[in-house]
């Protein structure tokens, strides 16, 4: 009896650290509850805003151990949309992001740091225009919980600035960088 009780206790003790693993989520693009947006200077006089309409990804999030969290995203660069067809055609061309040649951009996190009060630093490798560089996204945990359809969700926002020259994207005038704004909501798998 004592051996059996000891074995059961040992099994529970071993399993406990693994029972609190990160929860896995798929980014909800089907329900349009996520967006990848950009803002770039237009000749130094104003800003052009747009988005990527097609992307997919997933993330793991462990509220108790943020360092175990991760995110992976694939963006269809041909889906760039600034609400102006001719401009979009030009931005997608070889003059800028060359979406015909580089139809995907990817982000794979390598490190997530808890900065306190729901703030996160998400560092990872961004591949854009055929070039892979490390970037850091300043993110914020918005919330998590049950949805009305019986599922579980978690949401984040994030911002980062990309220097176009870092990704060998031609710079035109004052447009040397693009600001990215991310709204990510995931549905638990």
UniProtKB/Swiss-Prot annotation:
Main location: periplasm
Keyword flag Signal: yes
Signal peptide: 1-22
Domain of life per record: Bacteria
Keywords, sorted A to Z: Periplasm, Signal
InterPro entries recorded: Lipid/polyisoprenoid-bd_YceI, TTHA0802/YceI-like_sf, UPF0312/YceI
Record's subcellular location: Periplasm
GO annotation, cellular component aspect: periplasmic space
Similarity comment: Belongs to the UPF0312 family. Type 1 subfamily.
Name this protein carries in UniProt: UPF0312 protein VIBHAR_05924
